[in-house]
């Protein structure tokens, strides 16, 4: 739940990319782990040191709810997520919006 809450609280500027130098870019939420990783990258850390540093970080975020030292993978779209919704609600909302827009377009063109 901590991971979900972090996504919901995120603003559009709260993500960063790690792993560019190593050739394995990953967009994640900014946190202590991300800042330290980027610092290590800029200082020229070896690939193995970076791997060792991040080992288990995704597990810590997802299963243990560690939002500080866990890797909170997230796209830039995180800033647009404002609530937790079920997939069913999202799909139903999309279909409702589609039907409303289709009706509006048909009225304009008739």
Give the ranges of each region predicted by the language model:
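Conserved active-site-proximal phosphate/metal-binding subdomains
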Residues: 1-110
């Amino acid at each position: 739940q901590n991971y979900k809450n972090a996504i919901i609280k995120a603003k559009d500027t709260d993500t960063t990319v790690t792993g560019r130098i190593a050739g394995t870019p990953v967009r994640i939420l900014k946190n202590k782990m991300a800042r330290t990783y980027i610092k290590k990258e800029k200082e020229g850390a070896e690939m193995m040191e970076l791997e060792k540093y991040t080992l288990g970080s995704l597990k810590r975020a997802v299963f243990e709810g560690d939002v500080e030292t866990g890797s909170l993978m997230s796209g830039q779209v995180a800033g647009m997520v404002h609530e937790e919704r079920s997939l069913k609600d999202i799909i139903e909302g999309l279909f409702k919006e589609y039907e409303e827009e289709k009706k509006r377009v048909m009225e304009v063109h008739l």
